[in-house]
Amino acid sequence: MNAENNIPIIELDKKDTYLREISSKYSTHHYYDVSVCRESGSWRIELTRKAFASRLDKNYHGKLFEDHIEETRVFAAVLGNRQVGWIELGYDKWNNRLRVWQFLVEEECRTRGIGTLLMNHAVKIAKEKGARMLVLETQSNNATAISFYLNFGFELIGFDFAAYSNEDLEKKEVRLELGLKLQ
């Protein structure tokens, strides 16, 4: 299916959208192992793709239109009469970046180009806004998403070894920040 020609993208409104909470799950066989080594006068940080001993299944629950997001815009991909993918964007005026706060394609609709369609739409919105970069967060254990973002042109711009817990390194779930330069 060529999503570009067949799937409309609509903008949702906070006042009339039925969808406030979103849920997703993903399975992965790989992760990026993050190692941090402090040596005399320097830090050495490596991210190495490795295989889990067995498949990891993760569930995610989030909300759209959170109050803390500045200039929120939410878009949905519509297949037939059903919304099957969403991307939530927020503009960070202080550093002129557009952030992807939520990005989800329903599991049965993945690998059909819907994610690419939504991300292309986010790039269009970011350029219209004059943002210098499109940024997002993912986790080091979501190798499939990381591959998608890297293939799209995103690069690693940062990480947080304790974003979710004090044991993120041990859990193989390190917050990664990825960015796509637009200017």
Which ranges hold each PLM region?
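Generic detector of contiguous secondary-structure segments
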Residues: 7-21, 131-146
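C-terminal "cap" of GNAT-fold acetyltransferases
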Residues: 2-6, 132, 139-143, 152-155, ...
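Acetyl-CoA-dependent GNAT
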Residues: 13-14, 18-101, 106-108, 119-121, ...
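Short, charged, low-hydrophobicity "junction" segments
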Residues: 1, 124-135
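Alpha-helix boundary/capping detector
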Residues: 44-49, 107, 115, 126, ...
